Amino acid sequence: MADRLLDRAWPGDVVVEDLSYNPIAVMQRLEDEPPERRFTRAVVVAAVERGNRPPGAVTAYRWDGVLPNDEEIQRAVAEAVTGVIALDNTLVVTRHFGGLPDEVVIIEVEPGVQEFGDDFSEPVAKVIDQVCDLVVTMATDAGAVARLPSAGLGGALPIATGNRFG
């Protein structure tokens, strides 16, 4: 996904990066930005199996930033230390330790098959270009971001299924 996004033209204040690694390292990466270049918005894209959406469904929302209880935060940190790489875990850890900007846009795609590799499942392949367009819009258009629903982890209802946005 990051490779496809890197092929696009971006304004100078947008950074495209693959952050699919340890949540503690992601937090440290975000904190590495000098104060004058700290991010004001993060747009995070991930394939996440929620089980309540058809494969290829796209969900976009502004994360409300609400963290789970202390026990769940501790579990997320422990999982991060042991190498768990998952969207919710990364968001909880990076928010808890103050690495995320206030404005976080989440774009989730329900995978057809969730496994490591360079190829997308057929349902995801059908929507990947539209997902890339959505990422560009969310990274560059504050008005479009403002129109997204605000939601907790797991987000709102899908905005697209199959090969078209609804």
Where are the regions a protein language model picked out?
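N-terminal catalytic or cofactor-binding beta/alpha core of small enzyme domains
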Residues: 1-99, 106-109, 118-129, 138-166
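Hydrophobic "lid"/C-terminal helical patch
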Residues: 135
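Glycine-rich phosphate/diphosphate-binding loops and the adjacent beta-loop-alpha structural elements
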Residues: 115
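Short "lid" loop at the C-terminus of a central beta-strand within the Rossmann-like core
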Residues: 112
